[in-house]
């Protein structure tokens, strides 16, 4: 596991650099496996003290119930300072994945994130994105510069030579920091197993009620999911490789009910973990355009 030690050391170095270079850093906590690893690394980086920055969760009100329960449990256990932000204007306008299509992600995620960062005055924003996840993230720097409107310009980024990071920003500007940039999905699971890091149970396979819609298995998490004509929820063995808003996150059929079984599945996987994210499939270069508008 020597490569895990190397990845861990690099991530801890990046977290400490962030705390040292920025006036007001924050860690984006999306509750998934990468966020769980980030929380663990942040505790290690500043032990025995608690992380010297708050955690931020953008709550769209459409997360899986198990995710919210897990979030509240872990925050209470670790004693971290958690900020939960929701786009109240979007909620009051009745914005949902079913009524607003692609605009839902912009309103409830991107606009909500920009709003939270502006209100908080955060200049160093730590996230759990990895380069192996998606092609636009593959070309992103560890310290990824954002302008005063939180927008990302892939052609206006700083060189990162010899693990030296430049966190200088002007008024209103910020930097997104990605300590897990060089990790792979398999690395994440190997580290979770080695360090006994708790994760949301949705990552583990078990019988769950799902409907098959447009080639994706959508879990019926509550009664807000409108069933289309001819749809009937079926109980199938499924799990999730990635987690987001439940109407926009497809499950995969699996019997991997333990961490070793998930890792065994990863070793033969030939598809991206984000294949289940319906928001990535609305148009070509979708993620890059979202990021340029301020998305995670």
From Swiss-Prot:
A single MF term (Gene Ontology): sulfate adenylyltransferase (ATP) activity
Keyword Transferase set for record: yes
Pathway: Sulfur metabolism; hydrogen sulfide biosynthesis; sulfite from sulfate: step 1/3
Signal peptide: none
Reactions accelerated catalytically: sulfate + ATP + H(+) = adenosine 5'-phosphosulfate + diphosphate
InterPro entries: PAPS_reduct_dom, Rossmann-like_a/b/a_fold, SO4_adenylTrfase_ssu, Sulfate_adenylyltrnsfr_sub2
Keywords of this entry: ATP-binding, Nucleotide-binding, Nucleotidyltransferase, Transferase
EC numbers: 2.7.7.4
EC class (word): transferase
GO biological process: hydrogen sulfide biosynthetic process; sulfate assimilation
Keyword Metal-binding: no
Description of how the protein assembles with itself and partners: Heterodimer composed of CysD, the smaller subunit, and CysN.
UniProt record similarity statement: Belongs to the PAPS reductase family. CysD subfamily.
Function according to Swiss-Prot or TrEMBL: With CysN forms the ATP sulfurylase (ATPS) that catalyzes the adenylation of sulfate producing adenosine 5'-phosphosulfate (APS) and diphosphate, the first enzymatic step in sulfur assimilation pathway. APS synthesis involves the formation of a high-energy phosphoric-sulfuric acid anhydride bond driven by GTP hydrolysis by CysN coupled to ATP hydrolysis by CysD.
Protein name, per record: Sulfate adenylyltransferase subunit 2
Lineage: Bacteria, Pseudomonadati, Pseudomonadota, Alphaproteobacteria, Rhodospirillales
Name of the coding gene: cysD
